[in-house]
């Protein structure tokens, strides 16, 4: 008896097994023991991992193993522990000898492990958190494949050292497991134990025990256990990946599946790696599956198959169907019985993109006598029968197991369909019964009966049938659940009686009776074994030759049935069995057949079909006979009658011009959508992306390991200009620089990616965009790499790189996945938020063209629509004659893979077609019409263009070995036919570049005007115009774009058995095309795109534009010679064609007729292209006639190029060549028209010159040839209106969550389709997203990850490159601000004085010199352009020197600004939150939001006449700036430094910033501006805005103004700041005087800064010398800290009252900075001495010009104002808040009339509409725009200004004012020589007296304006000042502001001077 370890089984071992078998049978309820020999192996089920594999041990279900063979109805037995020996230890975690066995206790202790033993961890129910360490003989553990664990047990106690435990029961008692269930090693030995790098023993992978046996349909508890890779020979470094089977080792091969000795003559293809069916929610009969998230098991596209392979040894004949085959879809499984051919035992893991769906095995319990599979079954039946296990028990199979395939997938489908839908469970729908087994089977029979002979059953169809049946039978209940709240009520009685088991065989037979024996029903009396034996007998006898499906039913028992379905149809069985092979197995299978010579029989067969013997002999004979003639004949036939020549005399193609480069509207729209999504991430409250912290953009594009795709992407990057725009490179950009931004994901990628990560870490202010192009490729989890990195280091590379922790956590990396097939990234576990998906927009909406495009995209949906429309020849076709021959050969050669047969047949067809076109007409019988058409047009296309432009034929051969065979064969035939220079054959493989012959390289360089001698084409796009056959290999396209000269897309060899949506659509995406929008399609649908085009039918990833730099021209002005052929019929396939490549009309041409009318072919091909319109028939006097030749003609052997050539490319829907008067335009075709003959004789047929194939290709999409199976799949629709292909499993790496899912809808948008897949699919365990939800977070989306999806070849590369450009522009814009850039005003009025500050090099002002300088009254700040000029002496100012007053509507007209890049010393708003200033802002993630306390600060103010209470909000972090009575007590004062303090890291002056309406946009973040220096910054806010400011600036000190100032202007804030600071100065002087500090030593300065100050600059002046006034200067940005430290260090600084700086302007004149200091007005950013200005107050009522008013008050008080001219401040333009916060509106709520400034005042007691605005604001605004009404003589009369006493009010730019102060000892200008045109008395106080006013002189008629708080004060002022003596008053000259009485209006009184 053989086993897998030793040659013979020892007798003692045999006796032990026999004993266990007897014991198990005694415990069982049945009398049938398990076969002894099958017990010698515990056939491990390699299922997907259960939850216990995910470290949960609390949900373990009772498992069955070989010791307990319970039958289905047997309940689990309770286990009674024997009493322990007296005196022994019974403590949990210790053995009976008292030794500690817990892993945590002995992990570091040395443990002796005997040879052949392994340390494992046992789980005890009483110690759920601990593992007990045991030593177990590894023979009794599963082997490397999870198989072949010997039954029984042998273990040692590692605690006390006791050895020789032979029974696990005894051992479990010794280690005190204290079990309540039967002691089974499968149940309790859970983990391998391994030592980590520190040598400590740790928990390793799960032990991969087999799952429980199927316990019956009424009492099944578990169908699988944890799947695990067993340990290697070494006990260390085990990689734990408990969710995957071992790829490549074929765990699906059951016992007996290994090659049965060396006698087998071919490798079996019965390995189960095909698509699995189980997609949904698990059946309630499998609770552990539900718990362990194993509902996501692989789903089949065709009915999946599990092979029944043989046992490991030939002698071991038994096979138990419960030995399951399970492979995950993410792996390639090794050939199950190919051990002799594959010597290595290391599994080979494939590229993730190359894997196919896999079969997941469910329990298939065997019972009864075994069934022997007859010998020679495959030879007799011509196909391997595929048996689907259905319901109930399944018998053992033995014998010739290589010739049969068994699958449990139908069983899985049945189980899924018996589970209720989740949608109804939540309504309490448990009362609704699932569909019965009898109904399931009957519906299956109905489904099989209606299948056509060429159809293959699909599990999706069956699932939908079950779902519809269940819904219809429970329609009433479903409606009740949907319409009413859940209520407990009985189920409605179904009107249809249920099918009973007794009725089932008869009903099934009745259903099958109408299908001509396609379905055969076998009824069994006792077991399925009878039916299977009967079926095998009928197969051997040939009685099932017409039967495709055999249904075997055993309904002998009371309530249950047994069933299975065998697929015996040769076509169906072959497809289903081959669909199990993964891509790698498929390639290995083909390679094996090629290297072993099995395909030689095909060649012999083809030779026998050739009438003249072997085809090679015929080729050699033809070559010898025609040597030297073929080339000349083709050359002669290709000469052109007329051709446009360039300057050098070389023919030029005028019909075709190259596409202009540029970003198309669609691409720009997508780029903007991408940018919008990035901005939304940044704007979200999660702060996952801080766009404000980035200064530039960098990127890396990751692509699959395809050399062509790599070069193609590099080309796009190189020529897009993105590197220049991002500032990453400078002109000229080289290709090598572009290559640095494209990463090919191959074995060398890791090092480059590490450098990318390092770069991102080192440049935190650069935003890195990581673009994952073709993102559906390689989704394998990195855990697979961790286990099998030695076999294939590229496995899981995408996951290892793009999902690594560094990428996920880097705050400056945004990941963008780009794909045409997003389905595998749209699962329940995806990392990408649905809000971060960007879908390609639709082009039409409600008939409106949303994006005007010059070209229309022609994708898969358009191909399908054009084919279904029927109004023209189809673009999608299948070749029925080819399919028929493949089917026939499949029957003749059943042991050859169909891909081999299909490839050899197609190559044979191409070879025969080339021979037929070249002069061997008899070979037309050995090809198909389709292949002949392709070949003929390929050869003729260069002859239609003067330059030799031709078409491309794409021949898709996925299998690389077959592609090499095809290339060699076609190249050989081409060489024997002397066609090497007529078209090229190119073998394209992802791992290699493009090889093109020298002749064709020369042509390409000529067409593209390339001078580089070393140039070679590197992308398929550069092959545009080259006549060629591109043999495109590789299991999946990797994003390669194809040129516009692609005319035929031959997909007849794609692997049609692997039916998943992604695989199909990416193959068909190769044909995606752009056609000209302005030229109507000659065939195809209307130019309307489906709404769901962007989401349904997508494929490869690259743009359609950007081919080559050269200008490809096409078109012809010459005639084309060739025979006229009638067109083939309109059929979609060649079988219906009456031509069939045989007898057809032709014209006899001799060599004498082939008279050249132009340069020979060789010269034509060298003609360079030129741009020009298409021109046809330009030769004068040309006669164009049509004649159809009708009879057969003799073919001239000396003119092989002029043989009859069927032209089926004339697809205009008309028989144009059959009508003599048909217009010539009907002759044009899209890929090479029929050759016509043009000779200069009158009686010879002449046709119009054909157009260049390149020009025609621009307006016609390619023609696609498909396998019949795929063709039917695409053109048949389901109930949703979509092609059936749309309902397939979306990707092999995902699986459905439930069978109870709706179909996709045709009306679904891209977003809706994404949500559909997110709801109904989950990733397989091998998928990189599988473990995403295991992190325990509900929202596991990555915040900086986006997904761009769009159809193939539509321009996604161009879109995301454009996105990078506009993202960079936006970041630059974010780092730029619009600052006011205005020149100083009134410079011509500057006071000229002999006293100027001449010490140009002084860093600080000299006090004595400065005091001698006069004060400049003129306002130079450009923001006061509309303000009144201040006169200091009589001036003669022309009226035109002052601007015209702005209109009221121009109040906020945009001022001149400049865009400036923010420096590192800028002030920021709330949108900036970089890492450096997070703590400063109070938003640091490691800190709680800043806690603040509210403090009251009260002081008395004489100006207000009452005590003022101000509130301080002080964050805890800023309390050190203040003095409190006690910690947390009363606020006493704000700390002030000393004048004598010297510190370079501390700013002495507290900064106060009044602000309103700018909580988001105010520039309050001074961290960078202060360069990190310690400073005190206080925001001064109004009470009603306190909360919002505190929210945005939680770590800032707030000074809250009293509520009475809520409607006040900035004057009130300035007034209270100054009053507060003076009061605080007094308090600090008192406090520090107690500490011995002199009062004058306390720092008296504060800073009052505008909230829009953004940056500060210093002018560096280079003085040439004292004598010379010439100097040079430059300006640079500096920190505010630098400026403050410099100013605060000024000598005698306390003698200055006000200090300030210039306003920045780009056009600052040298004279403005030449003098370092000026005595003039200061604005915006002032340093105020609150001590010196104690008696000078701000006017708390003012809204505008309060700083000018204050400056004049300070100067008149005799104080010094100093402006540092070499410092300047930049002010940002902020469009919100500030003075814009004040709106003047009517108090009448329904008034819609606009309020103009003239309405701001009214007569007292009038019925004027009152306004809702402060009286002071109305006054100031009225005077600004309408002061001429009060001062008519002052208008433009600058020599006679208005005298303004104690105030400055803006009277508009047309009126000048003269300011004087009434205070005693004040400094005023001399007014003795001045005559004033008006007098303004504003709220004058007691200092203004009648005697004071009498000093001034006024013009006759001058006007007076007195303004007071009320009418009484107005009259009192007139009397007190004796104004009536000189001024005439009238009652009508009294006014008030337009306020209601409660708003306290201001009153005016005007008068005229007498």
Curated annotation (Swiss-Prot):
Transmembrane segments annotated in the record for this chain: 1873-1893
Disordered: annotated span: 48-83, 238-342, 1083-1235
Function: May play a role in estrogen-stimulated cell proliferation.
Feature: compositional bias, Basic and acidic residues: 1083-1099, 1122-1133
Family designation: Belongs to the GREB1 family.
Keywords: Membrane, Transmembrane, Transmembrane helix
Protein's cellular compartments: Membrane
Biased amino acid composition, Acidic residues: 59-68
Pfam families for this protein: cpSF2-GREB1 (PF20692), GREB1_2nd (PF20688), GREB1_C (PF20267), GREB1_N (PF15782), TAGT (PF20691)
The name this protein goes by in its record: Protein GREB1
Sequence ranges of Polar residues compositional bias: 1187-1196
Composition bias type Low complexity, residue spans: 292-303, 1134-1146, 1224-1235
Family annotation (InterPro entries): GREB1, GREB1-like_2nd, GREB1-like_C, GREB1-like_cpSF2, GREB1_N, TAGT
Record gene name: Greb1
GO cellular component: membrane
């Amino acid at each position: 008896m053989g086993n897998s370890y030793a040659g013979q089984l020892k007798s003692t071992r045999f006796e032990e097994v026999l004993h266990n078998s007897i014991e198990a049978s005694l415990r069982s309820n049945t009398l049938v023991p398990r076969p002894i020999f099958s017990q010698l192996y515990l056939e491990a089920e390699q299922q997907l991992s259960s939850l216990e594999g995910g470290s949960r041990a609390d949900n373990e279900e009772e498992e069955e193993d070989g010791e307990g063979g319970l039958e289905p109805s047997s309940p689990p037995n309770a286990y009674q522990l024997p009493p322990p020996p007296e005196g022994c230890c019974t403590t949990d975690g210790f053995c009976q000898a008292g030794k500690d066995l817990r892993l945590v206790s002995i992990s570091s202790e040395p443990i002796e492990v005997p040879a052949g033993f392994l340390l494992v961890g046992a789980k005890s129910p009483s110690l759920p958190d601990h593992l007990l360490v045991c030593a177990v003989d590894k023979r009794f553990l599963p082997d490397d494949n999870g198989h072949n664990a010997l039954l029984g047990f042998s273990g040692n106690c590692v605690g006390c050292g006791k050895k020789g435990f032979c029974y696990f029961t005894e051992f479990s008692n010794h280690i005190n497991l204290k079990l309540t269930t039967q002691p089974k090693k499968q149940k309790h030995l859970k983990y391998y134990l391994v030592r980590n790098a520190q040598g400590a023993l740790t928990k390793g992978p799960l032990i991969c025990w087999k799952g429980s046996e199927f316990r019956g349909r009424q009492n099944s508890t578990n169908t699988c256990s944890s799947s695990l890779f067993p340990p290697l020979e070494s006990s260390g470094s085990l990689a734990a990946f408990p969710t995957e089977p071992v790829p490549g080792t074929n765990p699906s091969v059951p016992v007996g599946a290994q090659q049965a000795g060396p006698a087998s003559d071919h490798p079996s293809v019965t390995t189960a790696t095909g698509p699995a069916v189980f997609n949904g929610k698990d059946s309630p009969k499998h609770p552990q599956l539900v718990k362990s998230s194993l509902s996501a098991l692989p789903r089949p596209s065709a009915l999946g198959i599990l092979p029944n392979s043989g046992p490991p040894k030939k002698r071991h004949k038994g096979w138990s169907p419960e030995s399951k085959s399970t492979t995950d879809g993410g792996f390639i499984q090794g050939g199950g019985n190919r051990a002799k051919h594959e010597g290595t035992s290391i599994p080979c893991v494939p590229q993730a993109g190359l894997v196919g769906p896999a079969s997941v095995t469910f329990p298939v319990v065997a019972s009864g006598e075994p069934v022997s599979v007859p010998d020679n079954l495959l030879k007799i039946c011509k196909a391997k029968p595929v048996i689907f296990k259905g319901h109930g028990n399944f018998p053992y199979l033995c014998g010739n197991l290589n010739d049969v395939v068994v699958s449990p997938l139908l069983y899985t489908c049945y189980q899924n369909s018996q589970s209720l839908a989740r949608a109804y469970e939540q309504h309490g729908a448990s009362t609704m019964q699932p569909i019965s087994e009898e109904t399931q089977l009957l519906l299956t029979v109905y489904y099989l009966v209606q299948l056509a002979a060429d159809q293959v059953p699909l599990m999706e169809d069956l699932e939908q049938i079950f779902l519809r049946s269940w819904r219809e039978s429970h329609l009433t209940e479903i409606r009740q659940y949907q319409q009413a709240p859940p209520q407990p009520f009985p189920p409605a009685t179904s009107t249809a009686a249920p099918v009973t088991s007794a009725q089932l065989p008869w009903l099934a037979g009745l259903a099958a009776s109408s299908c001509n024996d396609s379905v055969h029903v076998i009824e069994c009396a006792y077991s399925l074994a009878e039916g299977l034996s009967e079926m095998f007998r009928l197969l051997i006898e040939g009685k099932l030759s017409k039967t495709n499906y055999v249904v075997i039913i055993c309904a002998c028992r009371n309530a249950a049935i047994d069933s299975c379905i065998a697929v015996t149809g040769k076509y169906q069985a072959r497809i289903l069995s081959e669909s199990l092979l993964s891509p790698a197995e498929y390639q290995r299978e083909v390679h094996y057949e090629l290297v072993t010579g099995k395909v030689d029989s095909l060649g012999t067969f083809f030779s026998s079909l050739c009438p003249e013997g072997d085809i090679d002999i015929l080729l050699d004979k033809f070559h010898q006979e025609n040597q030297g003639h073929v080339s000349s004949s083709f050359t002669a036939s290709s000469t052109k009658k007329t051709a446009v020549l360039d300057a050098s005399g070389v023919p030029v193609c005028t019909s075709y011009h190259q596409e202009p480069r540029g970003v198309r509207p669609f691409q720009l729209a997508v780029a903007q959508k991408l940018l919008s999504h990035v901005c939304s991430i940044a704007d979200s409250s999660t702060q996952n992306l801080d766009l404000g912290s980035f200064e530039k953009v960098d990127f890396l594009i990751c692509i699959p390991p395809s050399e062509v795709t790599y070069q193609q992407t590099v080309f796009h990057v190189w020529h897009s200009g993105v590197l220049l725009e991002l500032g990453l490179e400078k002109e000229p950009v080289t290709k090598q620089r572009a290559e640095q931004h494209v990463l090919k994901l191959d074995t060398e990628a890791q090092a480059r990616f590490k450098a990318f990560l390092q770069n991102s870490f080192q440049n935190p202010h650069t935003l890195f965009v990581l673009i994952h192009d073709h993102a559906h490729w390689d989704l394998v989890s990195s855990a697979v790499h961790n286990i099998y990195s030695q076999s294939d280091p590229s496995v899981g590379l995408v996951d290892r790189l793009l999902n690594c922790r560094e990428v996920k956590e880097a705050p400056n990396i945004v990941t963008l996945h780009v794909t045409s097939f997003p389905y595998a990234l749209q699962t329940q576990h995806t990392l990408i938020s649905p809000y971060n998906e960007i879908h390609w927009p639709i082009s039409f909406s409600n008939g409106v063209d949303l994006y005007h495009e010059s070209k229309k995209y022609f994708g898969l949906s358009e191909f399908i629509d054009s084919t279904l429309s029927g109004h023209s020849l189809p673009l999608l076709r299948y070749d029925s004659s080819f399919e028929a021959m493949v089917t026939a050969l499949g029957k003749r050669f059943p042991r050859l893979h169909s891909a081999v047969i299909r490839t050899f047949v197609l190559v044979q067809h191409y070879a025969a077609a080339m021979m037929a076109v070249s002069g061997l007409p008899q070979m037309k019988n050995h090809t198909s019409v389709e292949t002949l058409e392709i070949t003929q047009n390929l050869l003729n296309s260069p002859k239609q263009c003067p330059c030799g432009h031709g078409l491309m034929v794409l021949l898709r051969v996925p299998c690389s070995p077959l592609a090499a065979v095809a290339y060699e064969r076609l190249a050989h035939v081409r060489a024997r036919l002397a066609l090497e220079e007529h078209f090229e054959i190119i073998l394209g493989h992802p791992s290699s570049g493009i090889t093109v012959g020298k002749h064709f390289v020369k042509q390409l360089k000529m067409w593209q005007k390339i001078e580089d001698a070393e140039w070679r084409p590197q992308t398929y796009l550069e092959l545009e115009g080259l006549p060629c056959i591109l043999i495109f290999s590789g299991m999946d396209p990797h994003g390669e774009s194809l040129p516009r000269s692609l005319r035929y897309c031959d997909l007849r060899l794609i692997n049609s058995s692997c039916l998943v949506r992604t695989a199909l659509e990416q193959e068909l995406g190769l044909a995606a095309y752009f056609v000209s929008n302005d030229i109507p399609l000659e065939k195809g649908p209307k130019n309307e795109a489906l709404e769901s085009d962007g989401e349904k039918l997508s494929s490869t990833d690259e743009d359609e534009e950007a081919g080559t730099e050269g200008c490809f021209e096409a078109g012809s002005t010459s005639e084309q010679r060739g025979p006229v052929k009638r067109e083939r019929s309109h059929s979609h396939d060649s079988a219906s064609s009456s031509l069939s490549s045989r007898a057809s009309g032709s014209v006899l041409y001799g060599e004498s007729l082939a008279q050249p009318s132009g340069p020979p072919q060789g010269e034509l091909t060298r003609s360079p292209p030129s741009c020009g319109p298409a021109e046809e028939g330009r030769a004068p006097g040309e006669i164009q006639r049509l004649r159809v030749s009708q009879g057969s003609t003799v073919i001239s052997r000396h003119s092989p190029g002029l043989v009859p050539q069927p032209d089926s490319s004339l697809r205009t829907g008309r028989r144009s060549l059959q009508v003599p008067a048909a217009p010539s335009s009907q002759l044009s075709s899209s890929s090479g028209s029929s050759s016509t003959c043009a000779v200069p004789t009158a009686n010879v047929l002449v046709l119009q010159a054909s157009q260049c194939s390149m020009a025609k290709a621009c307006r016609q999409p390619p023609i696609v040839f498909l396998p019949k199976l795929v063709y039917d799949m695409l053109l048949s629709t389901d109930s949703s209106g979509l092609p059936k292909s749309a309902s397939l499993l979306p990707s092999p790496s995902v699986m459905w969550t439930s069978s109870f899912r709706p179909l996709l809808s045709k009306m679904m948008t891209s977003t809706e389709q994404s949500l559909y897949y997110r709801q109904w699919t989950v990733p397989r365990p091998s998928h990189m997203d599988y473990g995403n939800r295991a992190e325990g977070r509900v929202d596991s989306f990555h915040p900086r990850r986006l997904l761009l999806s769009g159809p193939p070849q539509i321009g996604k590369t161009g879109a995301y490159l454009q996105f990078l450009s506009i993202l960079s522009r936006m970041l630059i814009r974010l780092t730029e601000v619009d600052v006011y850039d205005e020149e100083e005003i009134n410079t011509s009025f500057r006071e000229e004085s002999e006293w100027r500050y001449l010490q140009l090099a002084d860093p600080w002002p000299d006090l004595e010199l400065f005091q001698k300088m006069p004060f400049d009254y003129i306002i130079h700040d450009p923001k006061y352009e509309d303000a009144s000029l201040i006169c200091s002496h009589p001036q003669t100012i022309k009226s035109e020197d002052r601007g015209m007053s702005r209109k009221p509507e121009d109040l906020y007209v945009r001022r001149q600004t400049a865009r400036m890049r923010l420096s590192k010393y800028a002030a920021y708003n709330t949108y900036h939150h970089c890492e450096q200033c997070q703590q400063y802002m109070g938003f640091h993630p490691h800190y709680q939001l800043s806690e603040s306390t509210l403090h009251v600060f009260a002081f008395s103010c004489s100006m207000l006449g009452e005590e003022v209470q101000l509130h301080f909000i002080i964050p805890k972090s800023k309390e050190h700036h203040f003095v409190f009575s006690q910690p947390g007590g009363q606020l006493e004062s704000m700390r002030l430094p000393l004048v004598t303090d010297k510190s370079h890291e501390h700013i002495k002056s507290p900064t106060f910033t009044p602000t309103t309406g700018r909580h988001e946009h105010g520039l309050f973040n001074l961290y960078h501006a202060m360069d990190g220096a310690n400073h005190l910054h206080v925001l001064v806010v109004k009470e009603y805005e306190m909360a919002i400011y505190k929210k945005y600036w939680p770590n800032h000190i707030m000074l809250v103004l009293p509520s009475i100032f809520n409607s006040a202007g900035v004057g009130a804030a300035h007034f209270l700041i100054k009053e507060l600071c003076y009061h605080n100065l007094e308090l600090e002087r008192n406090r520090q005087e107690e500490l011995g500090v002199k009062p004058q030593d306390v720092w008296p300065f504060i800073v009052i800064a505008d909230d829009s100050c953004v940056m500060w600059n210093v002018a560096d002046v280079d003085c040439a010398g004292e004598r010379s006034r010439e100097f040079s200067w430059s300006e640079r940005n500096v920190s505010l800290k630098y400026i403050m430290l410099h100013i605060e260090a000024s000598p005698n600084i306390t003698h200055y009252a006000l200090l300030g700086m210039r306003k920045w302007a780009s056009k600052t004149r040298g004279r403005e900075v030449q003098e370092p200091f000026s005595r003039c007005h200061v604005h915006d950013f002032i340093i105020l001495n609150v001590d010196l200005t104690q008696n000078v107050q701000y006017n708390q009522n003012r809204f505008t010009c309060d700083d000018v008013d204050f400056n004049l008050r300070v100067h008149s008080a005799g104080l010094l104002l100093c402006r540092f001219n070499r410092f300047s401040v930049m002010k940002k333009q902020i469009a919100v808040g500030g003075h814009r916060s004040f709106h003047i509106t009517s108090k009448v709520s329904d008034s819609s009339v606009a309020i103009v400034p003239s309405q701001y005042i009214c007569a007292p007691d009038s019925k004027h509409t009152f306004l809702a605005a402060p009286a002071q604001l109305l006054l100031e605004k009225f005077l600004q725009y309408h002061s001429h009404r009060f001062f008519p003589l002052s208008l433009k009369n600058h020599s006679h200004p208005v005298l303004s006493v104690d105030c400055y009010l803006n009277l508009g730019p047309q009126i000048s004012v003269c300011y004087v102060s009434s205070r005693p000892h004040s400094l005023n200008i001399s007014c003795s020589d001045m005559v004033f045109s008006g007098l303004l008395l504003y709220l004058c106080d007691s200092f203004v007296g009648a005697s004071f006013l009498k000093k001034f002189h006024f013009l006759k008629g001058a006007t007076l304006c007195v303004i007071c708080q009320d009418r009484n004060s107005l009259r009192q002022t007139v009397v007190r000042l004796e104004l009536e003596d000189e001024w005439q008053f009238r009652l009508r000259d009294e006014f008030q502001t337009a306020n209601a009485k409660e708003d306290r209006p201001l009153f005016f009184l005007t008068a005229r001077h007498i």
